[in-house]
């Protein structure tokens, strides 16, 4: 069995230099260690997922026996299919073997393997400050709440208070208890870190304005908070304003399964005003109560590990990174690996611009000395061996590059049947956006009735509105199975389409509910009709309208993007909602018929069987091309 990496052997008796030396030595041993696999004393031992051919070889069975087993379950597989850990365990038991996974450390799986291998002794753990993230709709008071908390409680009571925008802050209440707040630009950044495996936060505060209620970004924040699977506190803000209605907010949140304790739920609610600093004490008490119940602990007496919160390149100081220590203690002059970067910590300071020499669990600091700028969400670990740090960082960079090259090679709708048969697909995750709440509810009701044997169908978001960057960001955080975004009478703009393509997220657009259901069911059965890719050729803004007695309403247009051809299919978009899809009847420049209108050109158009075109409408031209399989 591979040895666990221990960095906490009697830390009180081992100095930092000796601990670092031992740590580097143990990692070197593990990197060079070959773990014995196969059948050992009647136990199937493995380190990673295996193909059917490799698995059969390791347990001394024929490929035919393995394939026969799956065939009896209705799965037609081949010897190159890579088995999941659950399938290997199932097969091991079927053939009379127990099973055990051994961790094997490599330069490529360095951070993941360390996370899995290190376990602290209970007696080495000490309580740490809870780490809190505030999320909510724009203008509901997130920034004001953070500012009020920072200005009310400053660690150590330093004059001047918190001055640095480092992405995280630690405050101390009147009883001396500390809380760390993560200040991300939005829930997209929060989820981006989570998608990289960096589970940064312990608690999410959902802020909702009492005079505004649940808004679109509130819904998005709820989705992200639930996916993070951490306790949620609701802070109803602006209770001092005219029109404030906290009870309405509580009622609205019930639709999202956010139910207050007073109504039989398990979500604590706090009412107040961030601007007037009302309710802040109760909010902090609630955070600390949850922290006490959850019993957040870490071992401070080991080499530090943590997460990069944000980073940038300073022209004078070089790469600068804001990091959060999750466990252990970071010392100045430590060498760290942070994702694909490494370097000695030459200088370290906190949110008050004060130089610090050490940073323990839950402490955010700014560090200088890395060779390059790391990415938000990168994990870091102390590695006081420069040669090894450089080697591991380079391997991480190669791994990242390979992942980027394959980012578009994900499961597509057309390949669902094959991946189900191969046993590679366990979940289909859907984000559903529609033009009305009625459409949303109808789609949810129909989708939940779909039954695909062996595959779980999850609706991770269903809401009214156009397809946004937030939807694509949420989709990119999903790691289990495939994710599809469905638009019902709504569609993405050019920026969102491009982002989805970059992330390898498939967007499907429909205007008939049963077509969505049929498409998913047929995909599971491998019966999809030829797939047509929609290519948007251009967009035009209607800037004026004219009535004509013979041909109806003429839309005076300006081409804002690409071009629109006379033969193009078009859709009319009003306030982000598709209100009509059809064909052009006429396309003119002055009095002349034209075949195409290019970017920045102007003219007049009419739509077949549609006479309700209005100023401000967007006319989007598109064509359909069959996707070559």
UniProtKB/Swiss-Prot annotation:
Record key words, sorted: Cytoplasm, GTP-binding, Initiation factor, Nucleotide-binding, Protein biosynthesis
Annotated protein name in UniProt: Translation initiation factor IF-2
GO molecular function term, any single one: GTPase activity
Coiled-coil region(s): none
Residues reported in the UniProt entry to bind GTP: 136-143, 183-187, 237-240
Localization of this protein: Cytoplasm
Organism: Mesoplasma florum (strain ATCC 33453 / NBRC 100688 / NCTC 11704 / L1)
Residue span of region G3: 183-186
Region of interest (G4), residue spans: 237-240
Region (G1): 136-143
Main localization of the protein described in the UniProt heading: cytoplasm
Region: G2, residue numbers: 161-165
Domain of life of the organism encoding this protein: Bacteria
Keyword Hydrolase annotated: no
Sequence ranges assigned to domain tr-type G in this UniProt record: 127-297
Source species taxonomy: Bacteria, Bacillati, Mycoplasmatota, Mollicutes, Entomoplasmatales
Function field: One of the essential components for the initiation of protein synthesis. Protects formylmethionyl-tRNA from spontaneous hydrolysis and promotes its binding to the 30S ribosomal subunits. Also involved in the hydrolysis of GTP during the formation of the 70S ribosomal complex.
Region (G5): 273-275
InterPro entries, alphabetized: EF-G-like_DII (IPR053905), IF2_II (IPR044145), IF2_N (IPR006847), P-loop_NTPase (IPR027417), Small_GTP-bd (IPR005225), T_Tr_GTP-bd_dom (IPR000795), TF_IF2_bacterial-like (IPR000178), TIF_IF2 (IPR015760)
Cellular-component GO terms for this entry: cytosol
Disordered as annotated region, ranges: 1-20
Family listed: Belongs to the TRAFAC class translation factor GTPase superfamily. Classic translation factor GTPase family. IF-2 subfamily.
């Amino acid at each position: 069995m591979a040895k666990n990496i221990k960095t906490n052997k009697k830390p009180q008796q081992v100095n930092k230099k000796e601990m670092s030396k031992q740590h580097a030595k143990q990692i070197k041993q593990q990197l060079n260690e070959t773990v014995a696999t196969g059948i050992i004393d009647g136990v199937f031992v493995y380190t990673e997922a295996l193909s059917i051919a490799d698995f059969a070889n390791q347990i001394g069975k024929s490929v035919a026996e393995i394939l026969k087993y799956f065939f009896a379950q209705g799965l037609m597989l081949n010897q190159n299919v890579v088995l999941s850990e659950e399938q290997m365990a199932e097969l091991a038991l079927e053939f009379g073997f127990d099973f055990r996974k051994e961790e094997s450390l490599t330069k490529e799986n360095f951070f993941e393997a360390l996370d899995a291998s290190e376990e602290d002794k209970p007696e080495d753990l000490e309580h740490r400050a809870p780490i809190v993230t505030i999320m909510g709709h724009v203008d509901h008071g997130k920034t004001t709440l953070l500012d009020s908390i920072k200005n009310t409680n400053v660690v150590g009571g330093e004059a001047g208070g918190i001055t640095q925008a480092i992405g995280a802050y630690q405050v101390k209440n009147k009883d001396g208890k500390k809380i760390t707040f993560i200040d991300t630009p939005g829930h997209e950044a929060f989820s981006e870190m989570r998608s990289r495996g960096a589970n940064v936060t312990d608690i999410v505060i959902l802020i909702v304005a009492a005079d505004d209620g649940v808004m679109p970004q509130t819904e998005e924040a709820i989705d992200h908070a639930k996916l993070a699977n951490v306790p949620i506190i609701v802070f109803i803000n602006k209770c001092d304003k005219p029109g404030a209605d906290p009870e309405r907010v509580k009622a609205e949140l019930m639709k999202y399964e956010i139910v207050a304790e007073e109504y039989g739920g398990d979500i604590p609610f706090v009412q107040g005003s961030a601007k007037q600093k009302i309710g802040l004490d109760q909010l902090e008490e609630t955070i600390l109560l949850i922290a006490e119940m959850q019993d957040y602990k870490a071992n401070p007496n080991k080499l530090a590990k943590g997460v990069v919160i944000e980073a940038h390149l300073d022209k004078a100081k070089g790469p600068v990174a804001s990091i959060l220590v999750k466990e252990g203690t970071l010392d100045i002059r430590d060498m760290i690996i942070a994702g694909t970067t490494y370097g000695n910590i030459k200088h370290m300071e906190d949110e008050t611009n004060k130089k610090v020499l050490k940073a323990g669990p839950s402490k955010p600091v700014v560090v200088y000395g890395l060779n390059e700028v790391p990415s938000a969400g990168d994990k870091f670990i102390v590695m006081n061996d420069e040669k090894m740090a450089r080697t591991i960082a380079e391997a991480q960079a190669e791994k990242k590059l390979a992942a980027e090259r394959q980012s578009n090679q994900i499961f597509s709708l057309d390949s669902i049947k094959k991946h189900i048969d191969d046993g590679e697909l366990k979940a289909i995750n859907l984000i559903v956006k529609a033009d009305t709440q009625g459409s949303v509810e109808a789609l949810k009701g129909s989708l939940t009735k779909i039954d695909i044997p062996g595959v779980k169908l999850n609706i991770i978001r269903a809401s009214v509105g156009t397809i946004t960057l937030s939807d694509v960001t949420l989709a990119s955080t999903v790691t289990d199975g495939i994710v599809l975004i469905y638009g019902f009478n709504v569609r993405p703009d050019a920026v969102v389409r491009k982002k989805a393509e970059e992330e390898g997220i498939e967007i499907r657009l429909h205007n008939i509910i049963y077509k969505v259901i049929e498409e998913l069911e047929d995909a599971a059965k491998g019966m999809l009709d030829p797939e047509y890719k929609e290519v948007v050729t251009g967009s035009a803004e209607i800037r004026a309208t004219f009535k004509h007695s013979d041909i109806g309403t003429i839309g005076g247009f300006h081409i804002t993007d690409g071009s629109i051809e006379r033969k193009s299919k078009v859709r009319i978009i009003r306030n982000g909602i598709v209100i009509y899809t059809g064909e052009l009847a006429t396309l003119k420049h002055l009095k002349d018929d034209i075949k195409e209108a290019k970017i920045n050109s102007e003219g007049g158009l009419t739509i077949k069987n549609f006479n309700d075109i209005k100023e401000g409408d967007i006319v989007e031209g598109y064509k359909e091309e069959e996707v070559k399989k």
